[in-house]
């Protein structure tokens, strides 16, 4: 592909350049591009042929109408009215208690006074919906606390100071006042009032500004300034009264909320996430249960998440990294219906307790990230915070965000420090067995490479100085969202092909949908203008602009000839004016955003632009609207504005990439189908290895999908693991989105499955950047219903509506994870935010002990994952090699080798575990071999996890019952039984080795209120026993479990073996001849089929598919008229003479046998480049370049002739 500044001759030559592994192609065929005139002879149709084509056109309309009806039947939930309003509880009665014997006690009434003054000063009280605080009833408090404890606290109302002090001294870090009980009841009741308001649809979200705090309070224990656990009571209250099944509790207080954790650590209906200062247990509350290794017990395993900070001075980038890499992916899989935040602000810079360096703007970002969950049902409950100014500003910033104000830009975001990277990596290691979305969330690197990274980080980071925090301000906007559109852009049309996918109706249908939903009326409509000559010349050559302008006066025949000089282009007399108007509209929107006229905007424009090069039109594009808009923004701002361009069009934006590849002020990120270089625009420009050049090295980021079916889970995984970490580190001042919607489900070109809800979430997550200054500019998208619904969903997000609930039917595909990982590996040297890695110790771990545990009942459909703890085993089939990874006790990377987490694949292993049955590199528990999973179960009631009574003792795989055999566990120095078994699986040797695991002194990291006053004693307690009488009782010691017998595992592998061959075909073959599957009827590569239906919880290897033909193909122009002699479906192969199974080429009408006979048609395609062939067996048409079946009205004529010859009658209907 041409680079910036090359002439059009080079541009035309680029079209014939092929991937070295791709079949040869002649000049008559291009991908997603028109055939060059004269390359393939075409006769002029006579009147009879024209009439017949008209008849076939009517038949073809039925299929298109069915597609539209199907899309219209999607449950897009866009008509639902978005809730508005932020609730606030702030009651003066909560200040009626203080420490009687210590006036300097940090938790005092002045905390709420400072907050109230700040909110009044910023005018926030008037913008909120105020709610009267109420007292929590005893019955409500008893949802979490014991009646005896509540009664004891009630008696404090009548105690004198001496008695209060004596009682307080029996607890850790508390004081008591005669009004403490009533204020604690009022604080809990305040949160419950907001729960009623949010779940009762009175408001969208809310904040309870209360004291005393609550997250340290336990079942029967006062602790850490806390009497009653407000968020814990609120969670149980929501479940009991409002029938909420799944609650997410986020605790960002600098102290670990052990009281909340202990309340729910065996409950899969509550996901608890805490990010706190730990310092290897040296920081209060000094509990091992506060470390990353504690993930819950019993059915609650995996539902407790701790990200411990092991040093002070942690910054915004560290907190954001934990949210992006850990919390958000897990929360999306969990699917909470309500989010509660234990919102302590003692991690803010200047707080005497926390000694951290987070900023109010950082907490605004965290709040914004959480607002995308649970349909926006979010409640913040004040916990700690003891620097009055920092506390007031932190509360104010979070409340601004709840109200819909844009997040302030971070002053010095940078990247997470090495200590934060270690903590996040350890948390991911501990959680990966329990959450499908976290599979391969960290990648293994050798210790030598990690040491090189550490040297680089030391050089890059340098000594850190606390920034001088500015006074945060929020813009006063006339309108929130600008909308630019002009019907005149519909004048650009194809004069020769009315069925070309880039039709004028694209923008009309979008605008009609925006108006139907009332979204257009909520936006500020901006009048577009044509781009000026100077604006166009910032990205395009004067010669090219003049050349395109000259087309306005060309005749039809000249326009047709001119169109053939470019890739996939049609030109009409109005093309130049429309392209100029589309680009000018984008520039007008940039002006409105940068001037503060609007916060963000959407440009509904055509023709698209991201393929347009400096001196050449390409791929339906003439002027690169996004690129010109970016340069215009830098021009009017007067400096090299940092601009992030995100291109989520399914095709790689080659033109945009080339225009900024040497410019570090513009970060270009593209997610697109690449298919090993065979998907348009073809070549290697869209590969992950393309990183920019010169000063722009590292500022070009390509996530190259190597297949179809990419959906919400895949794009969000890329967002969390790659796009957002880099974006926050870059810290853009403006975000431009090349918003093509051809990756949407139902699009005829993309073959992907992104939903409108998915696009809404992608948009929302980007809105935290650049102070909310984001502009969406329409690119591709060729299903009118899909693009209309998708743009409407994005517009709602821009307007501040919470993203709709997003149910992910499956985890990310293995192919998607491979693409994301490939890009991360390329870019981790340029972006420190990507260095969340496992460490490969070349010497191996000092201990090979493997401790397995029994999963009582899976709260998620990954039963097998729950059969190993953080000490994981990597199994390599065919080699008999087992790599055991043992985490040292409460360790993190950076400690001694014996305490280092090591889980790695060998160097020569492929990156994906199950490819053609050749290599198996999965944990025993995962057992996803041959494309299926052991013991998958689903719960109809709990999307993100099973209900508490869900039990499983036998798992059915492929129709076979796999009994979980058990053995006795020796505890207290004894070892688990060692079992070794080798059996042949598909020709490979599978060696199952379970190493010894010493369980000396195993304890649970938990305190109990009755036996450990002060919350410091660590005691051993048994796990809850299983409720299923068929399941053997679990071991009473955490970390021990009966093992799966070798015979059971081998039997399951044999059951699953059948799927490995078909799965391996698509992922292991090169994009050359061997991957041109599907020539024979029914022989299409399943990975290239359109997804029709799937079972929730299944991996990509186990999804069920049906072959669905594409309704349009860019290579249909290569179909030539039928020869006068007609077709003979009995004609033998032109090479070998077989009549067994033959295909006819639709360009030259030669007949050859299929790939499963002698493969002569495949050879013909390789020699001629002719793309489309028709099966004489079932009359299906196959396109080699699209790697898909195609059914379009252009094929109906030849299909009907073949049908007549085969059956003696016309086709009754399209099939």
UniProtKB/Swiss-Prot annotation:
It holds the Pfam family zf-UBP. Induction: (Microbial infection) Up-regulated by the presence of SARS-CoV-2 N protein during viral infection. The SARS-CoV-2 N protein enhances HDAC6 stability during infection by reducing its proteasomal degradation, leading to elevated HDAC6 levels. Residues 1018-1047 have a biased composition (Polar residues). Zn(2+) 3 binds at residues 1145, 1148, 1164, 1170. It comes from Homo sapiens. This is Protein deacetylase HDAC6. Its EC number is 3.5.1.-, 2.3.2.-. Zn(2+) 2 binds at residues 1133, 1136, 1153, 1160. Its main location: cytoplasm. Keywords: Actin-binding, Autophagy, Cell projection, Chromatin regulator, Cytoplasm, Cytoskeleton, Hydrolase, Metal-binding, Methylation, Nucleus, Phosphoprotein, Repeat, Repressor, Transcription, Transcription regulation, Transferase, Ubl conjugation, Ubl conjugation pathway, Zinc, Zinc-finger. The modification Omega-N-methylarginine is found at residue 33. Its cofactor is Zn(2+). Belongs to the histone deacetylase family. HD type 2 subfamily. Phosphorylated by AURKA; phosphorylation increases HDAC6-mediated deacetylation of alpha-tubulin and subsequent disassembly of cilia. Zn(2+) 1 binds at residues 1113, 1115, 1183, 1186. The modification Phosphothreonine is found at residues 1016, 1021, 1027, 1031, 1034, 1040. GO terms for biological process: actin filament organization; aggresome assembly; antiviral innate immune response; axonal transport of mitochondrion; cellular response to heat; cellular response to hydrogen peroxide; cellular response to misfolded protein; cellular response to parathyroid hormone stimulus. InterPro entries: HDAC_PDAC, His_deacetylse, His_deacetylse_dom, His_deacetylse_dom_sf, Ureohydrolase_dom_sf, Znf_RING/FYVE/PHD, Znf_UBP. It is linked to Chondrodysplasia with platyspondyly, distinctive brachydactyly, hydrocephaly, and microphthalmia: A disease characterized by chondrodysplasia, severe platyspondyly, hydrocephaly, and facial features with microphthalmia. Bone abnormalities include a distinctive metaphyseal cupping of the metacarpals, metatarsals, and phalanges. Affected females show a milder phenotype with small stature, sometimes associated with body asymmetry and mild intellectual disability.
